[in-house]
Structures are given as structure tokens and as C-alpha cells.
Amino acid sequence: MSESQNNSSDQHMDRYFFRAAAVDFKKIPGSPIGYWVSSRQFDCFEKYPQLSTFAVSSNGVQTGNNAKYVRLWSEVSASKVNIRWYPYNKGGQFRRWYGNFDFLVNWENDGESIKSERNFCARGEEFYFSKGITWSDITSGKLSGRILPEGFLFDASGPSAFFNDSSLTYIGLALLNTKFSDSWSKILNPTLHFQSGDFRKLTLAPSYISESTRLTAKALLKISKEDWDFYETSWDFTSLPLLHPDHRQSALKASYRRLRSHWHEMTEEMLRLEEENNRIFIDAYGLQDELTPEVPLNEITLTCNPHYRYGGDKTDDELEAMLLADTMRELVSYAVGCMFGRYSLDKPGLILANQGETLADYLAQVPQPRFPADDDNVIPLLDGDWFPDDITLRFRQFLRVAFGDAHYEDNLAFIEQALNVKSKRNYGLREYFLGEFYADHVKRYKKRPIYWLFSSPKGSFNALIYMHRYRPDTVSVVLKYLRDYREKLATEKERQAAVSINPASSQGEKTKAMREVDRLAKVLTELEDYERDVLYPLATEQVQIDLDDGVKVNYLKFGAALKKIAGLEAKDED
């Protein structure tokens, strides 16, 4: 082959291969292969000090038995937080700046019990409860750093770092959330993990340590925390955003528009600040020719941003419909919380959130509620207005109190239309409660529901209770509702039977009545079996629960009396 042919072949191959000098790889700690990296980026590792110079990172606590020692914060009594149960950072989904704070760990008496576990392991114990930064170990998407407030423990799923100079904490957080760090995380560890050792190998340019960087990070953190606390799954949740004075109007549609506008402004501001953070970084590291500051909208990690929350290839109209539907589901969930006394329209934050609390405890905190809590902790979900405290009736009352009477019908229609995502005919609030509501609740609370659904085999009888208000006689109260309901159905069956033989009834009326008689007979048989075989024996047991044991243990004590939750019996990962 001639020299010209060789040159031509080399040029052809250059189209498909990167060329890099082996000596450049040695500039990266651990010498990983990053063949696509430019020489200028290689120089960053040689020129600037590693984060190990400024911070210590650690994998924290390995409990050895998560099923025994770890809970979602909503599972236990609020009064035991920071006494027996302590905030526990376990990584979580792709989210930057603030959030993913869902768990508690049993660290009573300085972890006395947990430390006796054979597989227990403690790393970086001197940093427990200290302020730092954290990230999710598994990075199948993007690297995402978050602040770790004081008062937390953490595990290997949420490795954390603590700076020698606390003023660098926000600098480190800002650095971790740049495009550069995300790119380099894939080089330092090409697996789906970014571990504490990988963090220490990132570099920090002195010129990036500035008040501008710090203020940008704090502004981003503030927006992210506001977004996280919008939702009742945050322990700092106070009230529904729709009910905030800045957004609430008498017309729910107008309230939502105001809130949606606020969410859009938050998203746009975070986008601007994210790009500003990247710009500061690029200038500090001299990478103007290597990187651009732009951030795609689906990486603005706010739950109120539908492009992030839902992702995929959906149109803007589809995303908006999904966000509206979820916002209405959150309104319904908050209303149910007010029905049980977990929340109140008259006082922010949690009201009843400790085991065994009663209506008297509620009235001690909210003496004159505009919308009172249910008196017996049992709310029926049925196919009609059979009881005055039926969940559909109670929600309608809530809607009138929260938004007034002036636009009540329009407000109700707005909710029902938003919830009817499958465009079903004759779909209303009752259909939502009987259909999707409980599945939504179970999903919201990560298969550890705080409201439990007593449900007959075919769902003809349903009653909801709040586990924090559960008492050993609660099942007996549910049983009384069931028996009252059976009596009402039996009376209705007799009435329909009378219609079917009444000479004054038309043939169509008689046929319809006979069908209803047959249907009610089947329902009554179902309810008789449910009472005899399931509910009555359970009521006589006077079952005791302990919230410290968690939903998984307590829910399963009630067997077939409660709605089955798929996967609840699965083994927890340690």
C-alpha cells in the first residue's frame, strides 16, 4: 500500500475513533479511560486540587436490617422523631439541591439496639447529624447533589460529604450540580454508581470559590425546598398550595391558574440560575470552548415542573393535563387528611400525627374548626349517600368551606373533569373515590399507606380509617357500619321487590326493579360472608398495633379485612 493510501486510510479511520495519549489518562485520579476528554479538561485534574483536600466523604450507616430499623417518616408517631426515630438520608430519585428526605432510622440511645446487629456497620460516625452535601449513589440518569441539613444520619445509597470549612458547603453543592461534574462522574466511575471515593477525586478551582457561586447555590436551594414542601409527603408540609392566600380565589380554576403561573416562574428562575451556575464554573475552569451552560427543561428538578415530573415524549398539552390531574388528586388527599384530623383548614402543619390520638386531642388544637374532623375515625366509601359521613359527601362539604359557595358547582366540575383522565362517561367524584383514590394514596406513600381501606371481597363495602387514630375497638366501629349498611340494603331490596310486583309499575320499571333485587341479593351475600368470616372474628380479637413496627407489619395483621396491596409482603432491601 502506498504512503498516500495509508494517509487516506488514517483519515478515514479518524472519523470513527478518538485519539488520546496514555499519559493524559494518568492525570485523572485512578487513571480511568476517558478517551473523548479534551486536553484542556485533562489539565483540570492536574492543575486544581481534589475535593479530598477540602472535604471528607463517607457512606455512613449500614443498619444490617432495614425492615427493623428504617421507616418512612409518615409511618411513626411525630412525637418520637428525634427521640427514637431520626432523619435518615438514603439517596433517592434524580433531584438536585434539596429533597428526597423520606426516611427515619431507629437511633434511640445513640443507636444502642441497631449497633447490636451482626451486619451493622458505621462509617464516618463523627459526621453524623452534621451539615453537608449528599447525592444518590445510583446515577442511571444524572448526578444530583443536595444539601444535607443538620440532624441527619445517612447510608451508602446517599453518600455524603462534609467540608473542613463550612463556608465551602454551598460551593461544593454548586460544583456537584454542574454539567462538568456530571460528565466527569461517568469517567471516574463508568458504572451506574458515584461513590464517596469518586466524589473526592473531583477538582475545585480556587476562582470558583466566590460569593457569586455561594449565592447562586443558596437561591437554587431555596426554590427546591419550597417545591419539596408543597407536598404532604414532606415533613415540613404546612398546607395545600392551592389554599395559600397568594393563589386562592373563590373559583378553583382561577386558583389553579395563579398557582400554575407561580410554578412556571419558579421553573424559569431555576433554569436561569442553573445555567448561571454552569457559566460561573465554565469561566472559573477556562472551559468556554469546551462546554455550554444550557440545561434542558426536563433537568430542572422541581416536582411542579411537568417536564421533569413526567418526562418522556409527551406534548405540552399532555403534560399540563397530567399536572392538573395530580394537583386535583393532591387536593382530594389533603381534604381526606382534614376529614381525619391529620390536617386542618384552621391550623398549618400536622394536627393528629401520634398513635392513638382522638377527637379530643384535635379539638384541643383546633377548638372551633370550620371543617371538623370525623368523630369515630371511620369514613365509608360507598356507591351512594348511605351515611352522612360518606367520603363523597364530606369532600363536597370541604369544598364549600375551603372555596365558598359562590362557585361550588363549577369548582366540583373542574375537579371531576381533571380527575377523569380516561374521559369516561358519567364519571364523577364518587367514581374516583371508589376507583383510583386508594391506589393513588398507596402510590403517594410508597406502599406504606397511612389511611387503611377495609374492603369486602368484591368492593361492595369500603371504609377508610386513619392508622394514627386506630384503637383496638376500631374494627368494631367498622363492623357497625357494615351491619347498618346491610340493613339499609335489605330495606332497599324489599322496596325494589315491591316495585317489581306493583300493578301500577310499568313493565320497564318492574324489569329494572327485579334486576336490582338480584344485584342486591348478591351484594348482601357478599357482605354476610365478609362479616361472618372476616370482620366479626377480627373485631373480637381487639387487634393491637404499634406504629413503631411500621405499616408493613401492622397492615398485614388485618389480613383479608383490608384491601390487598401488591408487593407489601416483599422482603425489604438492607
What are these regions (language model features)?
Residues 136-201, 208, 216-223:
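Basic, amphipathic alpha-helical recognition segments used for DNA target recognition
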Residues 268-272, 278-282, 286, 290-574:
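Terminal accessory regions of large proteins
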Residues 201-204, 502:
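General structural signal for alpha-helix termini and helix-helix connectors
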Residues 1-116, 121-132, 140, 214-341, ...:
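Polynucleotide-recognition surfaces of large bacterial nucleic-acid defense/processing enzymes
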Residues 57, 63, 67-68, 73-74, ...:
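Extended interaction regions within the primary functional domain
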Residues 211:
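Catalytic palm subdomain of template-directed nucleic-acid polymerases
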